[in-house]
UniProtKB/Swiss-Prot annotation:
GO terms for biological process: intermediate filament organization; nuclear envelope organization; skeletal muscle organ development. It comes from the Eukaryota. Residues 2-109 are annotated as: Head. It is found in: Cytoplasm, Myofibril, Sarcomere, Z line; Cytoplasm; Cell membrane, Sarcolemma; Nucleus. The keyword Nucleus applies. The modification ADP-ribosylarginine is found at R58. Belongs to the intermediate filament family. Residues 109-417 form the IF rod domain. The gene is DES. The keyword Glycoprotein does not apply. One of its GO terms (molecular function) is identical protein binding. It comes from Sus scrofa. This is Desmin.
């Protein structure tokens, strides 16, 4: 609006000064005034007005098909003046003011075009950079989509197979250790049962030994009693012998007295035979009693001796059995201690294996969780790259639209600058023809819009759309 207003002011000033309207095409923006030829004074003298005309040329550049605009200053041209009618005077001060205003406007437009040119070049460089980054991201997305998941899946499956194999090996080892432990527990139970049996046998042997000791004590007491009885019998035998001898002496004395009386009394009957018979009977009875007593004593002594020998043999056998039982108990105790040590070592090894198995299992679970986390991270990163790719596509589309808008603005600015210069074609000014400008400006551009919809890192749908633009 400000440019249009300043342009209308310049036209009004020109009309006030030169009394005529410049020849502009209908609808073209006012860029530079055209000074008609005019005559000065009545003398028909001619003068010239210096006019600076700018030509805008375009060189084809970069990716968008447009290059930076360049304003080149034409050399100063002397415009011959034609003689005005009589009485017409040219106000040079007003023309200089208008010319100065025109130069100021053209300078501002040149600066503005230079800024637009720089901005346009920056946008083109940014578009190139974004296209390169877009291509790199697309290649990375394709690489991640085509290779990494497969490789990660292969590595994941391989590690899972290895972990399963190790778990099976550890399970087999644990089962084998459990079987060995059960066997050792069975052996231990059997040895404990055998130990209990041996302890019972030991108790029975001790009980038998105690009974044998009681029998030995009873036999000893019986032997002592028999010895005392033998002594008493010996004393009784000695006493009976003495009594018998006394009786014999008394009988002999009586016999002698009787013999004396018989000799003295021949008429008395003979008693010697009767005494002799009685003596013989007593001697027979005494010898029989002595022999019976000796036989009974000998039989009792032999019985007691045999019983003592039997008891001694039983005691010795009991002692031997007790010694053997003690040795067996000691050997069983040593064997039990060794088995206890073996059992403790096996239990310790089993606990170590269980701890190692638990630690390895936790490590494998951590590895599985880490691999799953890496897979989720890769999926999230892939989704992020896809979103960035979609955002870059959107930014690229927006930049394409903005570039097209700037291109149209620049084309309008070129047409606004170039159209006033076309009015000076009679003066043989060098300018670019509209056909060349059209051939330089109008280029065809194809924009491919690829829409990728993702959900949880997975590609759900893809859509491709092509737009053809004529620039």
């Amino acid at each position: 609006m400000s440019q249009a207003y300043s342009s209308s002011q310049r036209v009004s000033s020109y009309r006030r000064t030169f009394g005529g309207a410049p020849s502009f095409p209908l609808g073209s923006p006012l860029s530079s005034p055209v000074f008609p030829r005019a005559g000065f004074g009545t003398k028909g003298s001619s003068s010239s007005v210096t006019s600076r005309v700018y030509q805008v040329s375009r060189t084809s550049g970069g990716a968008g098909g447009l290059g930076p605009l360049r304003a080149s200053r034409l050399g100063a041209t002397r415009v011959p003046s034609s003689s005005y009618g009589a009485g017409e005077l040219l106000d040079f001060s007003l023309a200089d003011a208008v010319n100065q205003e025109f130069l100021t406007t053209r300078t501002n437009e040149k600066v503005e075009l230079q800024e637009l040119n720089d901005r346009f070049a920056n946008y083109i460089e940014k578009v190139r950079f974004l296209e390169q980054q877009n291509a790199a991201l697309a290649a990375e997305v394709n690489r991640l989509k085509g290779r990494e998941p497969t490789r990660v899946a292969e590595i994941y499956e391989e590690e899972l197979r290895e972990l399963r194999r190790q778990v099976e090996v550890l399970t087999n080892q644990r089962a084998r250790v459990d079987v060995e432990r059960d066997n050792l527990l069975d052996d231990l139970q059997r040895l404990k049962a055998k130990l209990q049996e041996e302890i019972q046998l030991k108790e029975e042997a001790e009980n038998n030994l105690a009974a044998f000791r009681a029998d030995v004590d009873a036999a000893t007491l019986a032997r002592i009693d028999l010895e005392r009885r033998i002594e008493s019998l010996n004393e009784e035998i000695a006493f009976l012998k003495k009594v018998h001898e006394e009786e014999i002496r008394e009988l002999q004395a009586q016999l002698q007295e009787q013999q004396v009386q018989v000799e003295m009394d021949m008429s008395k009957p003979d008693l010697t035979a009767a005494l002799r018979d009685i003596r013989a009977q007593y001697e027979t009875i005494a010898a029989k009693n002595i022999s019976e007593a000796e036989e009974w004593y000998k039989s009792k002594v032999s019985d007691l001796t045999q019983a003592a020998n039997k008891n001694n043999d039983a005691l010795r056998q009991a002692k031997q059995e007790m010694m053997e039982y003690r040795h067996q108990i000691q050997s069983y105790t040593c064997e039990i201690d060794a088995l206890k040590g073996t059992n403790d070592s096996l239990m310790r090894q089993m606990r170590e294996l269980e701890d190692r198995f638990a630690s390895e299992a936790s490590g494998y679970q951590d590895n599985i969780a880490r691999l799953e986390e890496e897979i989720r991270h890769l999926k999230d990163e892939m989704a992020r790259h896809l979103r960035e790719y979609q955002d870059l596509l959107n930014v690229k589309m927006a930049l394409d639209v903005e570039i097209a808008t700037y291109r149209k603005l620049l084309e309008g600015e070129e047409s606004r600058i170039n159209l006033p210069i076309q009015t000076f074609s009679a003066l043989n000014f060098r300018e670019t023809s509209p056909e060349q400008r059209g051939s330089e400006v109008h280029t065809k551009k194809t924009v491919m819009i690829k829409t990728i919809e993702t959900r949880d890192g997975e590609v759900v749908s893809e859509a491709t759309q092509q737009q053809h633009e004529v620039l």
